[in-house]
């Protein structure tokens, strides 16, 4: 069983912000086959199908670990994949990583504090301009919006391939270092 957690902040205020790219990808991965198995104990929206659990924590980003831990403790997945935004990567860049530091990402820090860092990460670049907090909580620019569908589709495909493969192989095949904006 594999748990895929997409990080973001709950509520309409944050729906289209850069910090919610993990939520956007979970929404793309979830099709009509997935059954909603959400429960208050999970502190998140949880969907399950064919050995795959999709999670969107309903905690705020800084507390994402509580939701990931609750789902992990209940379902005991063999594999955990976390999808999140990354300020240190250019907009549209996609990188894959297992373990390592949080890179200052508060959602990743929260997960690391509660379950350790022995899980796979799909890092989606959002770039960085000015104050980090305002930037991640801001909506995508018009130029970014034009490329967002392509970036999300590419990353969704990479995650689907990751489910069937090893992170090192997928990293070699799908890593995008410079972003997808042309």
Swiss-Prot record:
Binding-site residues, tRNA: 14, 60, 62, 106
Key words of the record: Cytoplasm, Hydrolase, RNA-binding, tRNA-binding
Catalytic activity: an N-acyl-L-alpha-aminoacyl-tRNA + H2O = an N-acyl-L-amino acid + a tRNA + H(+)
Localization (cell): Cytoplasm
GO molecular function: peptidyl-tRNA hydrolase activity; tRNA binding
GO cellular component, one term: cytoplasm
Predominant place of localization: cytoplasm
EC number(s) from the headed UniProt entry: 3.1.1.29
Any one Pfam family match given in the protein's UniProt record, by short name: Pept_tRNA_hydro
GO biological process: protein quality control for misfolded or incompletely synthesized proteins; rescue of stalled ribosome
Catalytic residues (UniProt): 19
Site-annotated residues for Stabilizes the basic form of H active site to accept a proton: 85
Residues carrying the site annotation Discriminates between blocked and unblocked aminoacyl-tRNA: 9
Keyword Hydrolase on entry: yes
HAMAP family membership: Pept_tRNA_hydro_bact (MF_00083)
The protein's assembly and partners: Monomer.
Job description of the protein: Hydrolyzes ribosome-free peptidyl-tRNAs (with 1 or more amino acids incorporated), which drop off the ribosome during protein synthesis, or as a result of ribosome stalling.
Family stated for the protein in its record: Belongs to the PTH family.
Protein name per its UniProtKB record: Peptidyl-tRNA hydrolase
Organism annotation: Campylobacter concisus (strain 13826)
Phylogenetic lineage: Bacteria, Pseudomonadati, Campylobacterota, Epsilonproteobacteria, Campylobacterales
Gene encoding the protein: pth
